[in-house]
Amino acid sequence: MRIPYSNLFSAAAGLALFASTACAAPVMPATDSDIAHAGIRPELDNAFYDSHGEAATPKHKPHAGPNAAPLLSASNADTTGLDSHYIIVLQPDLSEQEFQAHTNWVSEMHQMDIASQEDEYYDTSDSNYMFGLKHVYDFGEDSFKGYSGQFSSNIVEQIRLHPHVIAVERDQVVSIKKLETQSGAPWGLARISHKSVKYDDIGKYVYDSSAGDNITAYVVDTGVSIHHVEFEGRASWGATIPSGDVDEDNNGHGTHVAGTIASRAYGVAKKAEIVAVKVLRSSGSGTMADVIAGVEWTVRHHKSSGKKTSVGNMSLGGGNSFVLDMAVDSAVTNGVIYAVAAGNEYDDACYSSPAASKKAITVGASTINDQMAYFSNYGSCVDIFAPGLNILSTWIGSNTSTNTISGTSMATPHVAGLSAYYLGLHPAASASEVKDAIIKMGIHDVLLSIPVGSSTINLLAFNGAQE
């Protein structure tokens, strides 16, 4: 069976707040009026996930009519400039030869389609011109495989009928809204290193001196100001995914996130190595296709490092996306444990992706008074809460700049940092073992203001320090 057309997508979610302004990287998924929407974590049938949550790999017969792979979409779309852009997911067990043959077939079909169109399609400067394949995704053997590109509706229908195809999803705009500065002092590090915080504990971070030594943390975001003094030479540029963009963070969001993970003064894992993976343009916008390409890059880089487990941070998200959740789950299976933001809509996090990812650590935001932050998403998809209101960290503008901002985007790197911190102490741990440890170490039943009846775990991040 194919994925149901319902239960797949819901409203978009912003992930970082600056003053009263949402300032995360919300994914704005596309809308398709003929697809039903529901705001729950999608439960796919056994044709797609086995008992371990892995993508299953049944051999499908060729599609026909209603058996075509679903064309997925979501509500509250911003598809500006993305007409006819799609992301295609293939069976994960395809051989290298089958995968290559499939992409060759798509390219050939696309060229034949272009040749058959009106003259306007021959003008590559025309907005109607279809450019074909853009990204090809291959996370490794029996892992996430697929591609993205711009195709006519005729080619999309042919793709949906191909037996290798699991799903087709419309590409989506990812963006960060205007940033504003808030006043406030750092307190998050003190909170995650004390089971209960007394007045004298404010500003005191208790931690093991190893603090993420020799652990890699990938910041999948707007980039990182890698020469900031707070990174002490431990930050490097990994990849710039958006075509034609620069190897810089001209936004600030990614640099702030990286600082909470591993900077000298503001970081949880003060010896971890930061790798910048830019998936959002300096303007603060990007596409879902580029985000998935960034996740793929982290998997490939991690595998080449020879390390058993690395850490990833995604302080971005939006409407529920089967494709993004599947990609993130595959990354975790391949050894990159991702911390992802729950979202800032004061709504069910299961409405959002990658918050609905089963294998990532989904993080809600808490306040200095141990309350669930007024903006934080909640629900059964949230795994843990961490400090997310008035968080001081590194910033752009100079190599010493700082900024204080808020959101689940700020809570998430506390948990990514904790993951690196734990791996520094337990380098043989697998990605799933890291997630289990983070949850096991958490402080139970200290948070206030969690919505009654929301199935939300009352768990606050803690580094396990002995006071």
Curated annotation (Swiss-Prot):
Pfam families: Inhibitor_I9, Peptidase_S8. It is an enzyme of class 3 (hydrolase). CDD domains: Peptidases_S8_PCSK9_ProteinaseK_like. Keywords: Hydrolase, Protease, Serine protease. Disulfide bonds: none annotated. GO terms for molecular function: endopeptidase activity; peptidase activity; serine-type endopeptidase activity. Gene3D superfamilies: Peptidase S8 propeptide/proteinase inhibitor I9, Peptidase S8/S53 domain. One of its GO terms (biological process) is zymogen activation. Its EC number is 3.4.21.-. The active site is at residues 221, 253, 409. Residues 86-176 form the Inhibitor I9 domain. GO terms for cellular component: extracellular space; fungal-type vacuole; fungal-type vacuole lumen; Golgi apparatus; late endosome lumen. Residues 186-467 form the Peptidase S8 domain. Belongs to the peptidase S8 family. This is Sexual differentiation process putative subtilase-type proteinase isp6. It comes from Schizosaccharomyces pombe (strain 972 / ATCC 24843) (Fission yeast). The gene is isp6.
